[in-house]
Amino acid sequence: MFVQILIYVYLGICAGMILFNIATALLSRRREHRSFRDGIRLELTVSQELDRLAETGTVSERHLRFMERRLRRVNGMAAFDAALECLCVRRPELTRSYLTALNGVMIALAEDYCRRDEIEAAYFPYIIRKYRLLDGQENEALKTMLLDLLHESSIYCRENAMQALYTAGDPAVLVRALRIIDASSLYYHSKLLSDGLLNYTGDTWELADALWEAFDAFQPWMQVTLLNYFRFSSGAYCEKIHALLNDPAQDDEVRFACLRYLGRYPYPPAYADLLRYATPSKNARWEYAAIASSVLASYPGAETAAVLERNLYHPNWYIRFNASKSLEQLGFGYRD
């Protein structure tokens, strides 16, 4: 009897799970249908307003108030996103003008979204980045909101905020953002920042000037981040990088990044120093010799070959491996 009761209980649990899954699937389909329907309706509404914008050159106050109410809900913002995806393809110029007219609405929404939970708060800067709402706009309110999001614990909030700031084309606000991240105790992966800076939509030379001007004020890890960005963006900074490499006051990690930069962009005045760093020394960390051995692949010559051949016999595996790889890239075979 006890076994039968257990079987019936088990069957009841299984039936309950099946019913739960069916109900969840039906609700999910209903939400998807509602979201699709809302997107179509909102696309029609915005499209009609685009017609009015084309005729009169303005967006009605009534429509702006409607959009402010509509976009306060996350599902409304999602429907707006879906509508814009279509309209940006069909009517790109008018849609850009429409988004510019919506600037006041976005400012009003910014404070509201910043107070929400991290997922909803992260969605707002995603929309700003996706449709480049800051591009060419002197919108200090939105920029300030994005800077405030950099204090959030969620990496989604911080990364989406940075991605939005990259589209602003404003070097000064990016330096402010990097200073906030640099001073924060929250972890932010260096690669996210160095790769993100490559997405900057403004004048990259102005950005580089601003970053170099603020360079000394950053902590070593952020300096390495900036050097990695420079390494992947331009070879125009070899002279500055060479000076940093030979500055004993700089952190070792910063100097390692300088070595890697000079490996990507060969700089003849640095050749003698690279040979020196590639020669292992008891007074220097082994990483100098290992990285310099890899960098010398970009500097062919008899002295390069001699240093690398000596490093093949070094007890440190990384030095031996990098020396062998560089010799191989320079055309030396095993018989050589």
What are the language-model segments listed below?
Residues 36, 114, 151, 166, ...:
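Alpha-solenoid HEAT/Armadillo repeat architecture
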Residues 51, 110-114, 125, 146-147, ...:
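Amphipathic alpha-helical repeat scaffolds
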Residues 82, 90-100, 122-134, 159-169, ...:
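Structural detector for internal amphipathic alpha-helices that build alpha-solenoid repeat scaffolds
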Residues 116-117, 153-155, 185-187, 218-219, ...:
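Short inter-helical turns and helix N-cap capping residues of alpha-solenoid HEAT/ARM repeat scaffolds
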